[in-house]
C-alpha cells in the first residue's frame, strides 16, 4: 500500500533535534508534493514560576518563536517548497502538537526530533515526542 502524505507537520523549537526533523520533513514534502506545516509551541507553564519577569519572558518567547518559524520557513522555501505555513501556539507542547495543531492542519504525518532526555529528566519533564506518539491519530516519524 502506498501512502501519499498531503500535509506534513514538523514542530520546531530551535534545537538540533528539531532542525534534523525539519530537514527530513522538507525532503518528504518535496517527495510527496506535500504542504509543510511548521509549528512552534510557546510553553506558557514556565512563566508562572517568575511572576516578576512574566512580561519580558513572554515577549522574549514570542520573539524567539517568530524567529525560529521564519528561519524554518525560509529554509523550506529555499529548498523549493511553495506550500509552507507556520503555526504559533501557546500551551504545553506535549498536548498541543497532537491534540490541537495536527487536527487543525489535517496532518497526515508528524515528523519530530528525538529528545535527549535521560531517565531522571524524563520523569519530571516528560518527552514531547513520546506524548505526541501516544495522542496522535496520524503517522509519526521520529528523527534521530
Residue ranges and their predicted role:
Residues 1-3, 74-110:
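Structural beta-alpha unit
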Residues 27, 103-144:
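Gly/Ser-rich helix-loop-strand patches that form or flank binding pockets
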Amino acid at each position: 500500500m502506498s501512502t501519499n502524505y498531503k500535509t506534513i507537520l514538523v514542530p520546531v523549537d530551535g534545537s538540533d533535534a528539531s532542525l534534523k526533523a525539519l530537514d527530513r520533513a522538507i525532503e518528504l514534502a518535496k517527495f510527496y508534493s506535500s504542504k509543510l506545516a511548521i509549528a512552534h509551541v510557546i510553553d506558557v507553564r514556565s512563566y508562572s514560576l517568575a511572576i516578576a519577569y512574566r512580561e519580558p519572558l513572554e515577549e522574549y518567547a514570542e520573539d524567539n518563536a517568530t524567529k525560529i518559524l521564519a528561519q524554518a520557513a525560509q529554509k523550506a522555501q529555499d529548498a523549493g517548497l511553495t506550500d509552507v505555513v507556520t503555526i504559533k501556539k501557546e500551551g504545553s507542547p506535549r498536548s498541543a502538537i497532537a491534540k490541537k495543531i495536527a487536527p487543525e492542519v489535517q496532518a497526515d504525518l508528524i515528523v519530530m526530533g528525538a529528545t535527549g532526555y535521560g531517565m531522571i529528566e524524563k520523569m519530571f519533564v516528560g518527552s514531547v515526542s513520546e506524548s505526541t506518539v501516544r495522542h496522535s491519530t496520524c503517522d509519526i516519524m521520529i528523527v534521530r
